[in-house]
């Protein structure tokens, strides 16, 4: 996976809070109640720059129609075989050594990865992610601590019933990646993209925060101002899950 450089993001993120606040402007979904409510929620925080909501889209407790899933963090040392499976799916199987050729080296690196400042984490929850009335086993994989690390990404994946494998069909709708490579795995292009889940009036949504897109050669960041998007997956009349972009926001800096 090509690394997504966020050093500048980290610097700007840590600017003092007294910098004039900006706001997220709704550019798609103005007629949707949830989109308007979500805009009010994110703008209720001190947005001294567009990166405040990068790591996690916070919820203001005053907006009682919103809430988050109950996430539980996994012990990645005890579940290191599971971690290998997840990272293989995400195209990261050789980023931290080769677990097949040299498992001892891979485990040594893993100990540093899960205890250091830039720790990799996996959180799990049961969420009705496709709004069909049945809860799925959903995990959120965090590539590194945010905003402390140079590289970051957060992906959402759905597991099968016994949590032994990734359910590819149910995971596909969650991979709303701006850059999907035809020659790569299904999940290629999620790096630098921060996914999250929220619930509004008992309906489950997922959103995507993106700093920018990579150029064709993968070396240059092309900034985009459509940073935050919200998606909804629901079954159609035939029972097929359909995913739609419901809201789109761009950040407007204070003048």
Language-model regions: role of each:
Residues 148-173, 198:
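Beta-propeller blade repeat segments, especially FG-GAP/WD-type strand-to-loop junctions
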Residues 134-135, 202:
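Short coil/turn segments that connect the beta-strands within blades of beta-propeller domains
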Residues 4-15:
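Sec-dependent N-terminal signal peptides
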Residues 124-132:
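Acidic, divalent-cation-chelating loop motifs in proteins
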Residues 144-147, 211-213:
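Short glycine/acidic-enriched loop and turn motifs that connect beta-strands
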Residues 18-92, 181-255:
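Acidic, small-residue rich beta-repeat scaffolds with periodic aromatic anchors
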Residues 137-141, 206-208:
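Hydrophobic beta-strand segments that make up the repeating blades of beta-propeller
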Residues 114-122, 175-192:
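Repeat-based blade/solenoid architectures
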